[in-house]
Amino acid sequence: MSLYQSIVFIARNVVNSITRILHDHPTNSSLITQTYFITPNHSGKNISFHLFHDFKYCSADTRHYSQLIIFPVKENSRPTQVSRPLGGRPHESVFLPKFTRTQNSYCLTRLDRMGFPPPRKASTIMHFFQDDRTVMCSPKDGIPVSSFHIMICFLERRKGN
């Protein structure tokens, strides 16, 4: 099996795991459950991270997004409890893993055209570009993907301030 085939094999397993995790949530939940705003003060642009429940729907609607990023988060990471209205129902708790500084900087540096310098230490990230022929896997910690909780984000360039 070539390196590319190995990466695709791992990626597909991760996607299947994500789908199973997301199916634990109500299917009628609102699409966007949390938005992280990161302002790198680069060219006056903001970067926003949209966290989604329904992976299948998101993967079918990537035309407005530049990249799909999957963050593996170690199981011992403490989640942040956020109350958000989901699917028009009263607030319910959503547990979201925290971003680390390394994950933030690594994610931003993947946007080569923005000119961010590479981080000192790359975190473990499964990175998918919109073109599904370009799949990048960067496991640095030597930890099996199955031992992570998975968080998925679409990366979108916002207009204006």
UniProtKB/Swiss-Prot annotation:
One of its GO terms (cellular component) is cytoplasm. It comes from the Eukaryota. Disruption phenotype: Deletion decreases survival upon exposure to K1 killer toxin. This is Putative uncharacterized protein FYV1. The lineage of its organism: Eukaryota, Fungi, Dikarya, Ascomycota, Saccharomycotina.
